[in-house]
Regions:
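Compositionally biased, charged N-terminal/linker segments
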Residues: 1-28, 35-41, 107-108, 113-122, ...
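Short, charged surface segments at domain edges that flank catalytic/cofactor-binding sites
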Residues: 16-19, 154-198, 213-224
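Short, hydrophobic/aromatic-rich beta-strand segments within well-structured domains
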Residues: 30-36, 101-102, 196-198, 227
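Short, flexible loop/turn elements at secondary-structure junctions
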Residues: 36-38, 51-53, 105-107, 213-216
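Structural detector for hydrophobic anchor residues on beta-strands
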Residues: 43-45
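Histidine-centered nuclease catalytic patch
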Residues: 47, 52, 198-227
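Aromatic- and Lys/Arg-enriched surface recognition patch
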Residues: 48-126
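Short, cationic low-complexity segments
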Residues: 120-146
Length: 227
């Protein structure tokens, strides 16, 4: 958190897990909140869930760089190995793969803007939890998140049933947020079955994503404009 906050506006973040054994499942572009553990017990920001993908750690670094929350690929690998050692990792997935929760439209809060975590969050719980953002503690936390960001931060986002924050936040829309370059690359790679569109090459180190209509020529930064 502190490293990403020091980088300024990050736009997209790869919230990785040291193991790719269990996929993270949520509605596309639903809110994903960052919660600090004890003694802070606070919400320090949020992003919108773009997708989950199991990736080699080097590809995660190549696609997202310091948006992985580390200043270098070497430090990222050291952190992965340290966490795996602490948790007694014995994964069935390829050893170099990590679980990547890819987030866009990320907003991080300064300490003075941290939000009190849900009052019904179980003590010592370290696993993700889902909340109805239309009522109760879910509604309070999400409302306070929106109060801390510019009105246009998620203006192009349809969070739909994932938030249901009420009429005063406007009716749900179907326009999705722009993907960052890393999220675009992973989205296109997965859309083509991790294979080259021309040669059917499946070697990830030689694959890259490109725009059909160049982004500089107002081509959309979306999966259907990629190959």
């Amino acid at each position: 958190y502190r490293f990403l906050l020091s980088q300024g506006a990050v736009g997209e973040v790869n919230f990785w897990r040291p193991s790719a054994a269990r996929a993270f499942v949520a509605p596309r572009f639903s809110p994903f909140l960052f919660k600090l553990k004890a003694p802070h017990n606070a919400i320090c920001g949020f992003g919108l869930f773009a997708r989950y993908s199991a990736l080699p750690y080097w590809l995660a670094w190549d696609a997202f760089g310091t948006s992985n929350g580390c200043p270098s690929q070497h430090e990222m690998l050291e952190r992965i190995e340290a966490i795996r050692k602490r948790m007694g990792f014995r994964g069935a997935a390829p050893a170099d793969h990590i679980g990547c929760i890819i987030l866009v439209s990320v907003a991080l809060f300064q300490q003075g803007d941290w939000i009190r975590q849900p009052s019904n969050w179980p003590p010592r719980n370290l696993t993700p939890m889902g909340y109805d953002l239309a009522e109760g503690e879910g509604e309070r936390v999400w409302r306070e998140c929106l109060e801390r960001v510019p009105a246009d931060t998620i203006r192009d986002t349809d969070v739909g049933d994932a938030s249901r924050t009420g009429a005063r936040f406007g009716a749900p829309r179907t326009v999705i947020p722009r993907l960052g370059q890393g999220a675009f690359r992973v989205d296109v790679t997965e859309a083509y079955g991790r294979a080259c569109a021309m040669t059917d090459e499946h070697s990830l180190p030689v694959l890259d994503a490109a725009h059909i209509r160049p982004y500089a020529s107002e081509g959309p930064h979306t999966t259907n404009n990629g190959l």
